[in-house]
């Protein structure tokens, strides 16, 4: 009886906004209408089990019974939604027939920003980067539909049937009422919205590439804000133009040649039209394509395997740099195998950088002491092709050894092509220079002995006072100090440039063997100082840009992790 009483309470809710409850008492329908079509009304609803807002699609049976085709469309949509699961296809939750109220009810996920058409008209000033992002998501949904066995054709793709969550730009294809499973090689029936229908649809002989034509028209609508063929007064005029191969007038208003070319690819005759899978590879849609400010490509985040070390380690892997490197190997002598150790001051905290080369790869280990217990380390590995791997990790002074951390790093991050001992030597060299009492667990005396001697002598060298001083050591050469305002540690992708820039500074501004050098002229000194200032200005400019990109990458990764946890 208690359950019955609860049910009665739910069926007659005190909230005046709640108009209806589903048979399982899980979903409640509000009176707020969020969409309306010829036969279907969409209400805002709430899932009381998962605590999320959903869409309650309701169709009156009396309305669809007047048109048997509409009833079949409705059942077709329910069947398809139940079977499809993809990030860019609207998600189905439940459906039922209410005999008492004579309605068919479908619960789907809710899109707070409505249709893409409505959203685009509301936000008219949107960068092409966002439009490309929407296009990629639509194509990924189409690739999924067309990749089914047998393929599924949407047949009514338009911005009205594509939905968006504006808070994070998620786009999904919906309204599958006209979709069909292509049992034969070609479908036969004529159906869809005339403005978006491919020419072959009128000939009743088409396949899934008809959706690509519609997608092209969606792109046209997204960039012009108008329905294709809005110059036509009726469907007959549209049919006449489409069958004659006349493109919409709005296509001539697309000024960006790349955008126009991409749309035209989608509107080619069916025999020449590319598939969704092929269009996703088009240069126009590539993530690293040119945008307004030509950003640097973002690194991919590589998560370590599960384990204790994985909790304090992260690797990002970037593509080869597009900027030529002229100074990458100038001051790293692979034959001597001796490292370069650099000291700098970062807001009162001492930073140390160790650089070393091995078999065409260049290693840069940077460290900054957090407190008495731990040191923040960043290892950059730059291969001969310019690809950069960046490993961020914490080193605990009590309990950690260079060999232990190096072994775990190579195993967890699958750095199979790197030598454990080589990385351990880098770590111990840095720690010996940072912590005077540090006890190494690998032999590094042969690598640091001459450096320590040079370090004691370098304090006698005269140099102009600067905001920051770096003392650089290299095998038999004693190098005098020079200024460098770069902070340590630096950001991910920028480090590749920063390594190159630092090496350029070393070559151009550091005098070589003490007894073999001659005094530098004032003009030469001024030229070198200007060169350093130019490098620093360029560095600061790039750092500002990469910091923004890094933040975006971190936020995107966090979002993906959150979505994975929800699944």
UniProtKB/Swiss-Prot annotation:
Membrane-crossing segments per the record: none
Region of interest: Disordered: 499-528
Acidic residues compositional bias, start-end: 512-525
Gene induction: Expressed with a circadian rhythm showing a peak before dawn.
Keyword tags: ATP-binding, Coiled coil, Kinase, Nucleotide-binding, Serine/threonine-protein kinase, Transferase
Residues that hold ATP according to the record: 108-111, 158
GO molecular function: ATP binding; protein kinase activity; protein serine kinase activity; protein serine/threonine kinase activity
Active site location: 175
Enzyme Commission identifier(s): 2.7.11.1
PROSITE patterns for this protein: PROTEIN_KINASE_DOM, PROTEIN_KINASE_ST
Domain of life: Eukaryota
Catalytic activity: L-seryl-[protein] + ATP = O-phospho-L-seryl-[protein] + ADP + H(+); L-threonyl-[protein] + ATP = O-phospho-L-threonyl-[protein] + ADP + H(+)
Stretches with biased composition (Basic and acidic residues): 499-509
Coiled coil: 519-553
Any one GO BP annotation for this protein: protein phosphorylation
CDD domains (UniProt xref): STKc_WNK (cd13983)
Family assignment from sequence similarity: Belongs to the protein kinase superfamily. Ser/Thr protein kinase family. WNK subfamily.
Its biological purpose: May regulate flowering time by modulating the photoperiod pathway.
The protein's name: Probable serine/threonine-protein kinase WNK6
Gene source species: Arabidopsis thaliana (Mouse-ear cress)
């Amino acid at each position: 009886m208690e359950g019955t009483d609860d049910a009665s309470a739910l069926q007659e809710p005190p909230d005046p906004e709640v108009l209806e409850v589903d048979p399982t008492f899980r979903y409640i329908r509000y009176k707020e209408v969020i969409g309306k079509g010829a036969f279907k009304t969409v209400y805002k609803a709430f899932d009381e089990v998962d605590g999320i807002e959903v869409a309650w699609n309701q169709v009156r049976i009396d309305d669809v019974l007047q048109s048997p085709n509409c009833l079949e469309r409705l059942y077709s949509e329910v069947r398809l939604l139940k079977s499809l699961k993809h990030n860019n296809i609207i998600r189905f939750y439940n459906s039922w027939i209410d005999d008492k109220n004579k309605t068919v009810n479908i619960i789907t996920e809710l899109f707070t920003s409505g249709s893409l058409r409505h959203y685009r008209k509301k936000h008219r000033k949107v960068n092409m980067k966002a439009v490309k992002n929407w296009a990629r998501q639509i194509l990924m949904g189409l690739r999924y539909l067309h990749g089914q066995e047998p393929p599924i054709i949407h047949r009514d793709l338009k911005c009205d049937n594509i939905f968006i969550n504006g808070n994070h730009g998620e786009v999904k294809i919906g309204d599958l009422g006209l979709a069909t499973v292509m049992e034969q090689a070609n479908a036969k029936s004529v159906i869809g919205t005339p403005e978006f229908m491919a020419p072959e649809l009128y000939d009743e002989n088409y396949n899934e590439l008809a959706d690509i034509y519609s997608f092209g028209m969606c792109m046209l609508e997204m960039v012009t804000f108008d329905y294709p063929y809005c110059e036509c007064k009726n469907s007959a005029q549209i049919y006449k133009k489409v069958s004659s191969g006349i493109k919409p007038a709005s296509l001539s208003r697309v000024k960006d040649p790349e955008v126009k070319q991409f749309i035209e690819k989608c509107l080619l005759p069916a025999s020449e039209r590319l598939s969704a899978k092929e269009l996703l590879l088009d240069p126009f849609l590539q993530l690293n394509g040119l945008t307004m400010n030509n950003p640097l490509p973002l690194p991919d985040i590589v998560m370590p395997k599960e384990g204790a070390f994985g909790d304090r380690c992260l690797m990002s892997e970037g593509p080869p740099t597009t900027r030529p490197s002229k100074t990458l190997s100038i001051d790293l002598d692979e034959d001597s195998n001796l490292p370069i150790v650099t000291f700098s001051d970062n807001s009162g905290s001492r930073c140390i950088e160790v650089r070393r080369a091995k078999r065409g790869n260049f290693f840069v280990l940077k460290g900054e002491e957090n407190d008495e217990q731990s040191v923040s380390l960043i290892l950059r590995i730059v291969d001969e092709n310019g690809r950069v791997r960046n490993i961020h990790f914490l080193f605990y002074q009590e309990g950690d050894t260079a060999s232990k951390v190096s072994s775990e790093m190579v195993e967890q991050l699958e750095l199979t092509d790197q030598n454990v001992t080589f990385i351990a030597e880098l770590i111990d060299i840095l720690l010996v220079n940072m912590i005077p009492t540090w006890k190494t667990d690998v032999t590094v005396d042969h690598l640091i002995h001459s450096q320590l001697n040079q370090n004691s002598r370098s304090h006698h060298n005269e140099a102009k006072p600067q905001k920051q001083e770096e003392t650089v050591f290299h095998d038999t050469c004693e190098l005098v100090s020079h200024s460098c305002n770069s902070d340590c540690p630096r950001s991910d992708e920028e480090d590749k440039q920063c390594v190159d820039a630092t090496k350029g500074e070393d070559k151009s501004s550091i005098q070589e063997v003490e007894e073999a050098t001659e005094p530098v002229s004032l003009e030469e000194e001024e030229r070198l100082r200007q060169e350093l200032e130019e490098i620093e200005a360029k560095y600061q400019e790039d750092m500002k840009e990469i910091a923004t990109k890094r933040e975006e990458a971190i936020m995107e990764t966090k979002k993906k992790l959150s979505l994975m946890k929800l699944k």
